[in-house]
Amino acid sequence: MGRPEFNRGGGGGGFRGGRGGDRGGSRGGFGGGGRGGYGGGDRGSFGGGDRGGFRGGRGGGDRGGFRGGRGGGDRGGFGGRGSPRGGFGGRGSPRGGRGSPRGGRGGAGGMRGGKTVVVEPHRLGGVFIVKGKEDALATKNMVVGESVYGEKRVSVDDGAGSIEYRVWNPFRSKLAASIMGGLENTHIKPGTKLLYLGAASGTTVSHCSDVVGPEGIVYAVEFSHRSGRDLLGVAKKRPNVVPIVEDARHPHKYRMLVGMVDVIFSDVAQPDQARIVALNAQNFLRNGGHAVISIKANCIDSTAEPEAVFAGEVNKLKEEKFKPLEQVTLEPYERDHAVVVAVYRPVKGKKV
């Protein structure tokens, strides 16, 4: 019996898959097709496969995964098909990959639809609970048929017609994480005028747009021009979103665009966040209005304990005529984050 031929690019993939073979040989190979592959294949690939996720190995095992090696093990593991997290943005990821709205399949993670899906109203106005195999938060889609960041959509027939809901992923939105964490009231409801500081690519802004509805308005402020481009794309399809690409430290630069608002939501992750919120409140927030502030402890003081940082920020808000109402941490969705709700210049005798 002769030695097997080491084919560098042939039809069958050679001894271990060849370098660019058609099928990738017996278990995947370096660049082959069938099951592993560095950039090819059907199941394992680093960047190209159908099932394997981000870490499918360099030609890994039968199912992809971190331990597949160059022509290696049988099933792999870390980012493979059966992984509880599905790789970085893989098939079953509850996080759906973080970051940009161009997340491809990643954002589809989070909820398994099932045949029977029931939608019930949440105690907070404009927010809903989708009950299937798993429960999830959702908002009524203002732009039917459109996903913003790859999130799942659920259509329910209510007799008069079909209503579409967008699943709200708490791993991608700090506001959703705070609701899941038990926040009593976000004060964002249908008809609310909202000033959103730190809008990023418009992920949470799009859900706020759904919540406030056509009677409300969302002024979305983002300093980064790159994120601002994505935000503009969201605003083009949503008439109640006003995109503002400007520094939230200088509210006078956009004072001609923003009217008086009921709520300020802040997610700017800056050391002087309390001051930024106070400046915007002085310009735009009505007396008795509310601020909902997402605090990232590491951005304010990376050496102190998170609880001490949160307490320090609350004290700064008190100095700026805010009265804190409630505070929740965002575990397990975000580490060392808290959301604080405060009322601005509370009106005597009026419920806050």
Swiss-Prot record:
Assigned EC number: 2.1.1.-
Chain intervals for the UniProt region annotation (Disordered): 1-115
UniProt keywords, alphabetically: Methylation, Methyltransferase, Nucleus, Ribonucleoprotein, RNA-binding, rRNA processing, S-adenosyl-L-methionine, Transferase
PTM: By homology to other fibrillarins, some or all of the N-terminal domain arginines are modified to asymmetric dimethylarginine (DMA).
Deleted gene: phenotype: RNAi-mediated knockdown results in reduced 26S ribosomal RNA (rRNA) expression. RNAi-mediated knockdown in a ncl-1 (e1942) mutant background suppresses the enlarged nucleoli phenotype in the single ncl-1 mutant. RNAi-mediated knockdown in a ncl-1 (e1942) mutant background suppresses the increased 26S rRNA expression in the single ncl-1 mutant.
Catalytic activity entry: L-glutaminyl-[histone H2A] + S-adenosyl-L-methionine = N(5)-methyl-L-glutaminyl-[histone H2A] + S-adenosyl-L-homocysteine + H(+)
Signal peptide: none
Positions of S-adenosyl-L-methionine binding: T203, T204, E222, F223, D247, A248, D267, V268, A269, Q270
Cellular component, GO annotation: box C/D methylation guide snoRNP complex; Cajal body; nucleolus; nucleoplasm; small-subunit processome
Ranges of Gly residues composition bias in the record: 8-18, 26-59, 66-113
Alphabetical GO biological process terms: box C/D sno(s)RNA 3'-end processing; nucleologenesis; positive regulation of translation; rRNA methylation
Record PTM Asymmetric dimethylarginine, positions in chain: 8, 16, 19, 23, 27, 35, 43, 51, 55, 58, 63, 67, 70, 75, 81, 85, 91, 95, 98, 102, 105, 112
Cell compartment(s), UniProt: Nucleus, Nucleolus; Nucleus, Nucleoplasm
GO molecular function annotation: histone H2AQ104 methyltransferase activity; RNA binding; rRNA methyltransferase activity
InterPro entries assigned to the protein according to its UniProt record, in alphabetical order: Fibrillarin, Fibrillarin_CS, SAM-dependent_MTases_sf
Pfam families per the UniProt record, alphabetical: Fibrillarin
SUPFAM superfamilies, sorted: S-adenosyl-L-methionine-dependent methyltransferases
Function of the protein: S-adenosyl-L-methionine-dependent methyltransferase that has the ability to methylate both RNAs and proteins. Involved in pre-rRNA processing. Utilizes the methyl donor S-adenosyl-L-methionine to catalyze the site-specific 2'-hydroxyl methylation of ribose moieties in pre-ribosomal RNA. Site specificity is provided by a guide RNA that base pairs with the substrate. Methylation occurs at a characteristic distance from the sequence involved in base pairing with the guide RNA.
Subunit details: Component of box C/D small nucleolar ribonucleoprotein (snoRNP) particles. It is associated with the U3, U8 and U13 small nuclear RNAs.
HAMAP family found in the cross-reference section: RNA_methyltransf_FlpA (MF_00351)
Family: Belongs to the methyltransferase superfamily. Fibrillarin family.
Listed name of the protein: rRNA 2'-O-methyltransferase fibrillarin
The organism of origin for this protein: Caenorhabditis elegans
